[in-house]
Amino acid sequence: MQTPSENTDVKMDTLDEPSAHLIEENVALPEDTFSSHLSYVLYEIAHCKPIMFMIIIIVSLISLIVLFHDNDGCTVILVMSLIVASMALMVVAAFTFGKAITEQEFMIKLLVEVIARKPAGKEWGTVAYNMNQYLFMKRLWYTPYYFYSGKKCHEFFTTLIKEVNSGSHSDSSSNSAEDTQSPVSAGKTSNGLNNFYSIRSDPILMAYVLKATQIEKEAQSEYWRKQYPDADLP
């Protein structure tokens, strides 16, 4: 049972947090901020220090090649350096933008956002905005624009749930063959991901996953019932 002071604290916390429709009015997502997806990508690249560092090296090498194009020996060395730098740039870009953020507190934050806000439709924009701010404040991303839109955030959440659930199902179905598995194959999830993770071994996190999954399904069902009130949707 909560004490009067605890009840007061809960009420104050609730009052301090703006409601979803008020947040939505001030939500600034990349799809609303940038004129195109290309301009968004260029902005992200410009604020990623490792990528900008590699670009500066490549531009410098190109300038040196133009400057010393009459010197064959120097040109060969510079061209080889340019090739290596270009390959390094691709690796850095793939590592930076191709790898999903899987920091545990970030995933907990996302699950709790879904549980608390019961998002559907445009409400995912609010969740995306809050997650973008969280990632930026925690220095897990270079800009406050990780999720391009609410749709992208919803897709990330759906992928997270699928990976965790598919891992759970594969774990339970393979218990009988556990003794014959190699340590390497036993440690992998679908798609070779090792990291949807410690979630399955953490009962609290799994409880969040199950709760968020249930609430998201209910929110989606309610959303479509409101969109089509005469359709008698289940």
Curated annotation (Swiss-Prot):
Gene name, Swiss-Prot/TrEMBL: KTD1
Membrane topology of this protein: Multi-pass membrane protein
Biased composition (Polar residues): 177-187
Protein name: Protein-toxin resistance protein KTD1
Assigned protein family: Belongs to the DUP/COS family.
Disruption phenotype: Sensitive to K28 protein encoded by the M28 virus. Cells lacking all 10 proteins of the DUP240 multigene family show no obvious alterations in mating, sporulation and cell growth.
UniProt topological domain (Extracellular) ranges: 69-76
GO annotation, biological process: cellular response to toxic substance
Superkingdom of source: Eukaryota
Region of interest: Disordered: 168-187
Membrane-side (Cytoplasmic) residue stretches: 1-47, 98-234
Species: Saccharomyces cerevisiae (strain ATCC 204508 / S288c)
Transmembrane segments: 48-68, 77-97
Biological role stated in the UniProt entry: Confers resistance to killer toxin K28, a protein-toxin encoded by the M28 virus that uses S.cerevisiae as a host. Probably acts against K28 after endocytosis of the protein-toxin.
One Gene Ontology CC term in the entry: Golgi apparatus
Subcellular location field: Vacuole membrane; Golgi apparatus, trans-Golgi network membrane; Endosome membrane
Chain segments carrying region Required for resistance to killer toxin K28, a protein-toxin encoded by the M28 virus: 68-75, 147-234
Chain residue numbers at which the record places covalent cross-link Glycyl lysine isopeptide (Lys-Gly) (interchain with G-Cter in ubiquitin): 217
